[in-house]
């Protein structure tokens, strides 16, 4: 399963939910909206 908004993530292995336009923040290491 992909990671939801605000969940901890790894920028080098981004598992945030792309269908929700989420990307892993390089700075904060959590999933945020990428727009």
UniProtKB/Swiss-Prot annotation:
Per its UniProt entry, which superkingdom is the organism in?
Eukaryota
Provide this UniProt record's keywords sorted from A to Z: Disulfide bond, Ion channel impairing toxin, Knottin, Neurotoxin, Secreted, Toxin, Voltage-gated sodium channel impairing toxin
* MF term (GO), any: sodium channel regulator activity
Q: Which GO terms describe its cellular component?
A: extracellular region
Q: Which Cys pairs does UniProt list as disulfide-bonded?
A: 2-17, 9-24, 16-31
Tissue/organ expression: Expressed by the venom gland.
**Pfam families cross-referenced by the UniProt entry:** Toxin_12 (PF07740)
Answer yes or no on keyword 4Fe-4S: no
| Anything else known | Negative results: has no effect on human and rat Nav1.8/SCN10A. Has no effect on voltage-gated potassium channel human Kv11.1/KCNH2/ERG at 10 uM.
Protein purpose: Spider venom neurotoxin that blocks voltage-gated sodium channel Nav1.3/SCN3A in human (IC(50)=1 uM) and rat (IC(50)=1 uM).
Which family, according to the similarity comment? Belongs to the neurotoxin 10 (Hwtx-1) family. 10 (haplotoxin-1) subfamily.
The protein's name in its UniProt record: Beta-theraphotoxin-Hlv1a
